[in-house]
Structure formats: C-alpha cells, structure tokens
A protein has these predicted regions:
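N-terminal leader/signal peptides at the extreme start of proteins
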Residues: 1-7
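N-terminal helix-rich module
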Residues: 2, 13, 25-51, 55, ...
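Hydrophobic membrane-insertion alpha-helices, especially the h-region
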Residues: 15-23
Length: 149
C-alpha cells in the first residue's frame, strides 16, 4: 500500500479551531486596547485645552474660562471649537460653585497670575478612568491614570 502525502480532515479541522480561538482572543484584547486608547487621547486633549486656557489667561492678562457640558459630553476652550468626547464616555466634574452655572455645566476659570478656581474632572470609559486635577493656587494641571492618586 502506498502512503499518501497530505493532511487528514481531522488535522485540518484542528488547525481551523485553533485559528478561530486565536482570532477570538486577539479581537477581545483589541477592544479593550481601543477603549484604553480613546480614554487616554480624550484625557490628554482635555489637559491640553486646560493648559491652553491657562496660558491665554497669563498672556492676555485677563481671566479665561474653559466650559464643560456634562450633559452633551463636550468642552470648549476660549476661541476654540467645541470638542465632543467619544460615544459611551462618562464625565464627572467637581468645580468651584461659582463656576457651575447649571447642573449640566461646569467651568474652570484661570487668572492672569496663572492661578485658577480649581477642581477635578474624571473621565470614565468602561472599566477605565482617568482623572485631571486643576490646582486652585498654582493652576497646575495634572493627569492621573486609572488607580494613580
């Protein structure tokens, strides 16, 4: 009897099942990494907008305010277009009472000496969160990832 070269049906099916498992695992991991990328980018964009607002207050020797609309999940720096956060992202804003004109809006005011009204923004996306702290005395803006303090 001659030996035939090639693969049996069982061998081909085993390989296909293994490929399906690997593809499923990769797709699952990619979805988590996409969320991580989106929340990191949104957080860094908001930090950049806050720092821009602070620098404009110092350069122009005049108060400047960045407004956050919690209901519409957006923010606007002075003289800039409104920026909307990605779909599914949640916001929690803690700001000075004087900078909260309504339940759905809050702001961060920066003064000509660089100081601010201070506060905190927490961005939540799935099981991930980033926090932005704005120091009232110095106006320093710091970004903290997930579990950092």
């Amino acid at each position: 009897m001659q030996k035939r070269s090639g693969f049996t049906l069982v061998e081909v099916l085993v390989v296909l099942v293994m490929l399906a498992i690997i593809a499923g695992t990769v797709a699952f991991n990619m979805s988590g990494s996409m969320k991580a990328t989106k929340i990191r980018a949104a957080s860094k964009d908001l930090v950049a907008a806050l720092r821009y607002t602070r620098s404009q207050a110092v350069v122009k020797h005049a108060e400047q305010r960045l407004m956050i609309d919690v209901e519409n999940k957006s923010y606007q720096a002075p003289g800039k277009k409104k920026v909307t956060f990605p779909e599914g992202m949640e916001l929690k804003v803690f700001a000075a009472e004087s900078e909260v004109p309504s339940e759905t809006q809050a702001g961060f005011r920066f003064f000509s000496d660089g100081s601010s009204t201070g506060g905190r923004v927490t961005l939540l996306y799935g099981d991930r969160f980033w926090r932005i702290n704005v120091a009232w005395l110095t106006g320093e803006i710091r970004l903290f990832k997930d579990t950092e303090v």
